[in-house]
């Protein structure tokens, strides 16, 4: 005869094992996000662009296409942006977030699962230039159940590329590659050498909407010369020379690109100054080097690099030759003048001595 206590122990152990197994299974089951909000599904639109761009007038449309018979029509309100909309800086890009929602029109006919495909609609007739559209597809599953003698939406799930997600998000990028940067050189001073060339270095940093820096092309135009010299920068800093009236112009730059131009210091009796215009705004005005041997940079006081916007971008370096004494004596020629003076003094002294000797003989 089997001991009742032993039977009880076996039953208790089995119950505990079953309970543990059930707990482990529940803990391992992934939680599926429910995107249902009172029978609607929110959609977020992130419109991103680099600094230096004005927000364009653009409207984004969406479609929820039914994949299940007897499914209700799904409606989605458009999202529009206009000039003046301001974004929030995120990952070096300005992002303007707006929301809409999917709503279902009518009454569900029966319980079950209803499947929809949600996409962003590209309207060729209203497509805005330089805007990249999002080609993402979301699968929406709507679960309808009986509740209190009525048909209600129990939950709604969304998935992208086979993975469940808690949010339907579409991203669009606005990027332009038509900006221009001009770097020009001037010299001032009565004795300034208008043909003397000065050494410069420019270093670019890619726009946050670009994946790589790439190469930038420009031309140097020399004063009084109808020919131009091609310039190609490739990732690293680029060195160049400019004299009075010369100009380096870059074209087709991605808006949002940043840069720093430096005039190398030299002991040449010239003191450089610089003025910078970024996206039609003057950000550096008549900054002067402490002395002629100090390199002069366009970098802003807060350490930020200079921005290339969709409007005017221009750097003007002006080198001023040092003041000359009122006598008109140029210090570089002083040694020669002293030699001439010594020779004259020696000649006069010799003449006086000869006259004195002649006087004594008489």
Name every feature range the model reports, one short phrase each.
Residues 2-362:
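Solvent-exposed loop/turn and edge beta-strand elements of beta-rich ligand-binding domains
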């Amino acid at each position: 005869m089997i001991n009742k206590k032993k039977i009880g122990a076996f039953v208790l152990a089995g119950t505990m094992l079953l309970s543990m197994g059930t707990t482990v299974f529940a803990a391992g089951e992934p939680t599926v996000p429910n995107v249902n909000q009172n029978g609607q599904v929110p959609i977020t639109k992130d419109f991103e662009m680099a600094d230096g761009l004005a927000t364009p007038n653009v409207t984004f449309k969406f479609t929820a296409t039914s994949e299940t018979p007897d499914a209700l029509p799904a409606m989605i309100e458009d999202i529009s942006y206009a000039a003046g909309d301001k974004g929030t800086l995120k990952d070096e890009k300005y992002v303007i977030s707006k929301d809409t929602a999917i709503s279902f029109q009518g009454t569900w006919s029966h319980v079950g699962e209803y499947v929809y495909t949600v996409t962003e609609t590209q309207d060729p007739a209203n497509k805005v230039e330089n805007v990249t559209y999002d080609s993402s597809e979301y699968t929406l599953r709507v679960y309808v159940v009986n509740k209190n003698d009525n048909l209600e939406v129990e939950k709604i799930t969304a998935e992208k590329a086979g993975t469940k997600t808690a949010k339907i998000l579409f991203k669009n990028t606005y990027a332009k590659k038509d900006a221009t940067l001009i770097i020009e050189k001037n010299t001032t001073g009565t004795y300034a050498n208008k043909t003397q060339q000065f050494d410069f270095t420019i270093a670019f940093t890619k726009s946050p909407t670009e994946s790589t820096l790439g190469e930038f092309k420009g031309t140097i135009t020399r004063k009084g010369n109808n020919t131009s010299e091609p310039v190609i920068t490739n990732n690293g800093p680029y060195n160049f020379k400019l004299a009075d009236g010369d100009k380096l112009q870059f074209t087709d730059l991605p808006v949002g690109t940043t840069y720093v131009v430096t005039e190398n210091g030299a002991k040449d009796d010239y003191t450089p100054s610089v003025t910078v215009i970024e996206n039609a705004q003057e950000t550096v005005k008549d900054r002067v080097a402490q002395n002629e041997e100090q390199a002069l940079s366009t970098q802003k006081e807060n350490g930020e690099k200079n921005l290339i916007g969709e409007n005017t971008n221009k750097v003007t370096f002006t080198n001023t030759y040092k003041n000359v004494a009122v006598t008109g004596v140029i210090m570089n020629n002083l040694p020669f003048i002293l030699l001439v003076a010594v020779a004259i003094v020696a000649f006069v002294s010799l003449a006086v001595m000869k006259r004195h000797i002649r006087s004594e003989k008489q």
